[in-house]
A protein has these predicted regions:
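Conserved phosphate- and dinucleotide-binding cores of soluble alpha/beta proteins
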Residues: 72-169
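N-terminal active-site beta-alpha-beta segment that forms phosphate/nucleotide-binding
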Residues: 1-102
Length: 169
């Protein structure tokens, strides 16, 4: 049902929502203080934050995920080094890897988010595994989605990682 609502959003509504999400993230004290921020490269049904990512990269070290088998690792963002990778997502090819302990803030996509920070992903567990690792638990997690993806409650399992903040527009 959430995905059907996303399909009803016009391109201009998606772009406006993404810019509002970016502005709210930019005002977050954790984001402001962070030197290294992990972000996602959006799929078609996720907020199109790519423009904001380019803007952030002028002031911060931005790292983006690359999926290798069952693992997700983060690498420096360089817009000239991106290529379609796993699941049709733009991924870095030749940039330096960023260890989890250097990431201070992570902007996380979601299929749905609950107001308490519970997150529903795409079901493969990449973000939960990465963020659940001992050396990644201190990362400040900002879950992002369109307003139509925000719900009151989501069922959770012990391995699910809760977001520290939810930004939905």
């Amino acid at each position: 049902m959430v995905r059907a609502q996303i399909r009803l959003l016009s391109p201009s509504e998606r772009t406006l929502a993404a810019e509002m999400i970016a502005q709210e993230v930019e005002c977050d004290p954790h984001f402001i203080a962070a030197k290294t921020v992990a972000v996602f490269m959006p799929l078609g049904d996720e907020p199109p934050i790519r423009e904001a990512v380019g803007r952030w990269a002028t002031e911060k070290r931005i790292v983006v995920p690359r999926v290798e088998g069952d693992d997700m690792r983060f690498f420096d963002f360089d817009s000239s080094d991106m290529a379609r990778g796993s699941f049709g997502i733009d991924e870095p090819q030749m940039t330096a890897e960023c260890p989890p302990e250097q990431i201070e803030v992570m902007i996380v996509p979601a299929v749905a988010l609950a107001r308490n920070g519970a997150r529903m992903g795409r079901g493969r567990g990449y973000y939960d595994r990465y963020l659940g690792a001992a050396n990644a638990t201190r990362i400040y997690k900002i879950g992002t989605c369109f307003a139509c993806q925000l719900v009151d409650e989501l069922p959770t399992e012990p391995h699910d990682v809760v977001m520290d903040r939810v930004v939905a527009r």
